[in-house]
Amino acid sequence: MANKTVLFNKHLESDAKMVDFHGWDMPLNYGSQIEEHHAVRQDAGMFDVSHMTVVDVNGTDACAFLRKLLANDVAKLKVPGKALYGGMLDHNAGVIDDLITYYLNDTHYRIVVNSATREKDLAWIAQEVKGFDVVITERPELAMIAVQGPNAKAKAASVFNTAQNAAVEGMKPFFGVQADSLFIATTGYTGETGYEIIVPDSEAEALWLALLEAGVKPCGLGARDTLRLEAGMNLYGLDMDESVNPLAANMGWTIAWEPADRNFNGREALAAIKAAGTEKMVGLIMEAKGVIRPGMSVFFSDSDGVEQQGTITSGTFSPTLGYSIAMARVPRSIADTAEVEMRKKRVPVKVIAPSFVRNGKQAF
């Protein structure tokens, strides 16, 4: 039996096409993936992300534990509610998961991890926490709704109560605040402004219906994927996993090398990889007809004229740009043009930084 989120019946009421997503019955779309994509880029859309795993980390050693567990450094978080994105690495510097950490106070942090990696993540955390004065608490009674788009905050404001609107007023990106029963964060997975709202299961249906009434369009996994790829955001399992180090997954900016004495998991292995050199992640755009798909090969000649090869990790048709975009892991010697092999033919592509659309506009 697949898991169902607390909003399952609401999806059916909106005529969602349901699919299995890592053991969860989730909406793929509600009729038109393209319309849902454009709603988020131009207005406001919402996603049921209750399959994500919310974990609270409490105790006097919470900070010390997370400084060992994560490659980014939670000691940088000084203001309550501030959030941090980063990787949880194994001892070989492979990416176990990518996640967001919220600093609530010195003895309380909240992490949100991917659903597909839940059991693996919790087992790793349980193993690594030994010896620390920390209590790990999964919060399965909490649902999560992401409201994203240029009008998302205004439409959410019409649903929030006075205290909640006061709590989020002027809140910068990558913050979270507990406001009555809602934990409201200025985070997202679309490249647009908006909120990710953690809500008790018992209140999730009412919040979903209120947002629907406020004109927020329900959006499924299909639009979520095209939006995150346009924004150049990684999808765990496609763009990285334990076989990939963060430097080869456009996550170098999330590695806190300083202070030098912070011995985070995988540090030694990652330092050796960095010194030896590793592949990198690039963005590709293809204005010719066709769609670049994961697993396709990328070819280019390096400065010595030697042919090099890389692999597409994520690829799709970009509804915003009107042509195909992709992310690829390639040797570092790549320049600004390459070719992708499609149906035994090589098609030219442009090579850019892996970010295509932000806040509704072309980002390159």
UniProtKB/Swiss-Prot annotation:
The entry's keywords: Aminotransferase, Transferase
An individual GO BP term: glycine decarboxylation via glycine cleavage system
InterPro entries: GCS_T, GCS_T_bac, GCST_C, GCV_T_N, GcvT/YgfZ/DmdA, GcvT/YgfZ_C, TrmE/GcvT_dom1
One GO MF term attached to the UniProt entry: transaminase activity
Entry EC no(s): 2.1.2.10
Annotated disulfide bonds: none
Gene3D superfamilies cross-referenced by the UniProt entry: Aminomethyltransferase beta-barrel domains (3.30.70.1400), Aminomethyltransferase fragment (4.10.1250.10), Probable tRNA modification gtpase trme, domain 1 (3.30.1360.120)
Family named by the database record: Belongs to the GcvT family.
Quaternary assembly: The glycine cleavage system is composed of four proteins: P, T, L and H.
Protein name (database record): Aminomethyltransferase
Lineage start: Bacteria, Pseudomonadati, Pseudomonadota, Gammaproteobacteria, Alteromonadales
